[in-house]
């Protein structure tokens, strides 16, 4: 029962990895540059990118849960759609998706619209999911 975490080296991702490891989960971390990944020895580090289909297929092999944390970038929506389609293809049972508070209300804001679009895609695909809608992260302002 392996959990794949994308964005594992980011502010949120590092904390997710730490908490899952502390709870005894089998964690696989998707990173672009393994030399920059400093995780406990029990974490399996796989190199890949959310726009690299082959690396995602490899990373998702044998995974039961995908914790989808993708950065706020221009192709964020595309990254998520690729990941979701590959997760379905890989037979992943559960998606945990980090969205944003009020994504359904502020769809006129591009970032919110993208997050809400991903939420709708998860629903449309019939994937088992937990969608997290946190408020703003103040920690992101100091990094």
Predicted regions span which residues?
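Cofactor-binding loops of NAD(P)H-dependent oxidoreductases
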Residues: 48
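Oxidoreductase cofactor-interface core, primarily capturing Rossmann-like NAD(P)-dependent enzymes
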Residues: 1-41, 51-63, 72-75, 81, ...
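Short, basic, glycine/proline-bearing loop/turn elements
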Residues: 69
């Amino acid at each position: 029962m392996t959990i794949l975490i994308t964005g594992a080296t980011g502010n949120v991702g590092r904390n997710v990895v730490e908490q899952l490891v502390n709870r005894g989960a089998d964690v696989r971390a998707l990173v672009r540059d393994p030399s920059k990944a400093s995780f406990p020895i029990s974490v399996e580090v796989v190199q890949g990118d959310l726009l690299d289909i082959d690396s995602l297929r490899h990373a998702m092999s044998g995974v039961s849960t995908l914790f989808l944390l993708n950065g706020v970038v221009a192709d964020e929506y595309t990254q998520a759609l690729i990941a979701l389609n590959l997760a379905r293809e890989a037979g992943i049972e559960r998606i945990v998706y980090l969205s944003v508070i009020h994504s359904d209300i502020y769809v006129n804001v591009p970032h919110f619209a993208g997050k809400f679009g991903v939420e709708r895609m998860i629903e449309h695909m019939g994937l088992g999911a937990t969608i997290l809608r946190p408020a703003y992260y103040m920690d992101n302002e100091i990094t």
